[in-house]
Amino acid sequence: MTDETVKSLAEEIQTPVERLVQQFADAGIEKTVSDSVSQKEKETLLAWLNRDKDISTGQPSKLTLQRKVRSTLSVPGTGGKSKSVAIEVRKKRTYVNRDVIEKSQAEEQALREAEEKAHREVEEKAQREAQEKAQRAAEEKAKREAQEAKKQAEEKAKREAEEAKREAAELAKREAAEKNKVKQNDKPKADVADQDKARRNAELAELKRKTEEAQRLKVEEETRAAAEKARRLAEENAEKWTAEPKAPETESADYHVTTSRYARDAEDESDAEVEGDRRRGRTAKAPRAKKNNRHSEKADREEARAAGRSNKKGKRKSSTLQQGFHKPAVAVNRDVIIGETISVAELANKMAVKGSEVIKTMMKMGAMATINQVLDQETAQLVAEEMGHKVILRRENELEEQVMNDRDTGEESEVSRAPVVTIMGHVDHGKTSLLDYIRSTKVASGEAGGITQHIGAYHVKTDKGEITFLDTPGHAAFTSMRARGAQVTDIVVLVVAADDGVMPQTIEAIQHAKAANVPVVVAVNKIDKHEADPDRVKTELSQYGILSEDWGGETQFMHVSAKQGLGIDELLDAILLQAEVLELKAVKEGMASGVVIESYLDKGRGPVATILVREGTLNKGDIVLCGFEYGRIRAMRNELGQEVQSAGPSMPVEILGLSNVPSAGDEATVVRDEKKAREVALYRQGKFREVKLARQQKSKLENMFANMEEGKVSELNIVLKTDVQGTCEAITDALVKLSTDEVKLRIIGSGVGGITETDATLAAASEAIILGFNVRADASARRIIEQESVDLRYYSVIYSLIDEIKLAMSGMLAPEYKQEIMGLAEVRDVFKSPKFGAVAGCMVVEGNIKRNNPIRVLRDNVVIYEGELESLRRFKDDVNEVRNGMECGIGVKNYNDVRVGDMIEVFQVIEIKRSIA
């Protein structure tokens, strides 16, 4: 029989080929679609597939059921109506064949008991061997010590016997000598001597016996002591060797009562009853469900106790849940990463301590802080090191530096580039007209009021070379624009009208040029007028350090006329000569970088930014990072509105595709990765917000009274929308400078583009007026403005805007009140009147006395009363006015202490309106 392939087997059993290949792989058999399958491999696959089934019945050991219960719920809606909501409860439950489980558990139990039995036998055998080994070692040691003790005792006894023998020999020798002497001297006493000799021999024998007995007792005692010592040693070693080795501590399995059999049955019954309650109204069976719940809880507790008892009997660790946290015995030193700024709460979190501990440490170091206060890097480092942690300082702009370093700036040498020339000067001195003549177009006519209100960047090709011109506004409100123009320029052309001389913005332009260290070329314009006086211009400029070459200075003075075109060629020659002296060069290849000259929001094209390229080549499709914004260039246009594909150094272009309107003056850089550009832009936005919050000072003691007075200050809220970003900055700066101590001007919203519905809603909510500069409101915004009666004003010239805001703020100023003395009367006599009390008979000595005017009563030129003139009579007639030199009767309201000689002064309060200068 030929083996069939995997594909034919899949067709035979009607299963997908990929699934069969995967099942073979799961079973440990690597097969492809075209491989053959043997009978043995089929049996292996079948055995693997039946691993979860009962072999005897072929039924699965596990069964998973999914249950769905659908019901509806009435939910009250608007207008008192209720609506039905369909609810579907899905449950998934797994049932296990208990016979298979119990069988496997029994097998596991038997296997576990066999393992325990084998383990016990091995332990008992090892214990017996250890005991026998210890006993043998003790016996050998005791035997060895006994032999040594016996040997020592024998040697000692031998030595003592030899000494006793030697003493006996000496004694016998002495006795023999004495015996010879006795025989010679006294023969008859021989019997007595024999008796003494016998007695001494008996004493020697007794002494020898006692010595041997003492030696034997001593040896036996030493032997017993050695045996006892060996026995104790054997017992100690046996305890050590037979001690059961400590089992490694293992994590106790979490015991959950719902995993038991009875708990599962109780849970199933409870679920069934709850579902029945939902079908029948949920009222009748609720107590039973509660009872069943109590029953299941009781069963669970009993089962848990039984499990605990069985664990105790089996000497196994209890499986109940226990808390696993242990308080560290020693302080933990951490590596704390600190950026440029960090709050107290964040610092405490990184050190894993409470915020109060950090505040306490700072107080000990002499610094007061709150939980949300932002700390600088040095302070945070000192605090962390004081608390025993290691500090790792991290630069916040690490990602930004990485992105900027990963740029292809070009390897080629630098080439000459066109000079960037900024035309500066006082308003109406002819800057735009001069540039207009050079470009041979009429730009000035397009500006409202004939004055420039945003920077214009133009690239001009002349016969003598290329020049990039920047035209800046001359009005006082555009200081930031002129400063920005001076920063990106190479040469400043200072335009001064020959008939007007040096003006405030001319001086400011000189200061900007000196601050930027930029050479200046002076163009004395309007030279064709009869009132022109070029020498006066030279004299006035010399006072500010601008000396003509004729007078020994370094500045070129060119006499031009923008109307008639006089001296224009000479001016261009002077500019190109100055550029040649500066040797202006830039890298042409590589990723571009430049400066945002101007930006605005176009309704059809979105955010538009005018960029002056400084180095490299800016191509369509490049990813640009501009300050807080980023994006891919979708289109590029030159100053003539023509589409271009690339722009080199010193070329101004308009780009489309940024995420939002960038701020004028931001640096534009081409980067590789759009994702990293977005991260850098978001980081810059967050950093700007942090710096802004850090600058906001809390209310302190020194400015407490100023804060108390703020409630009395009138506020004028303004929503400002302009056509370009630079104009918005200029108007904002000019308006903020109008604020005084009594009237505060707040710009609650500003932006570039048309007036939208959001702007109108903001103005209505904050009671603000909307100022539109060269922009208009759309239909939805106009509807809200009409409904809420919001004050909306359009402007195209900045003079008119500032003047009207001054008038509005003047109307909010509190008026001044001045007292003017109208007349003075001398009291000549005092009369009593039942109606008015004391009436003063007076002579008018100065001015006129009018009725119902406030008066003062003077006595010895000291004011003693201030009140109101109640009654004025001449003779018996009531009059409204009494002139100088006439007599009258005056009744003072609520005052009766009028005396002769007093002076009555009549005055009036005049209201004087104030205005903002």
From Swiss-Prot:
Keywords noted in UniProt: Cytoplasm, GTP-binding, Initiation factor, Nucleotide-binding, Protein biosynthesis
This protein's name: Translation initiation factor IF-2
Domain tr-type G, residue spans: 416-585
Function, in words: One of the essential components for the initiation of protein synthesis. Protects formylmethionyl-tRNA from spontaneous hydrolysis and promotes its binding to the 30S ribosomal subunits. Also involved in the hydrolysis of GTP during the formation of the 70S ribosomal complex.
Gene3D superfamilies documented for this protein: P-loop containing nucleotide triphosphate hydrolases, Putative DNA-binding domain, N-terminal subdomain of bacterial translation initiation factor IF2, Translation factors, Translation initiation factor IF- 2, domain 3
Region (G4): 525-528
Species in which this protein is naturally found: Proteus vulgaris
Annotated region (G1), positions in chain: 425-432
Residue ranges, compositional bias (Basic residues): 279-293
Keyword Mitochondrion part of the UniProt annotation: no
Residues the record lists as binding GTP: 425-432, 471-475, 525-528
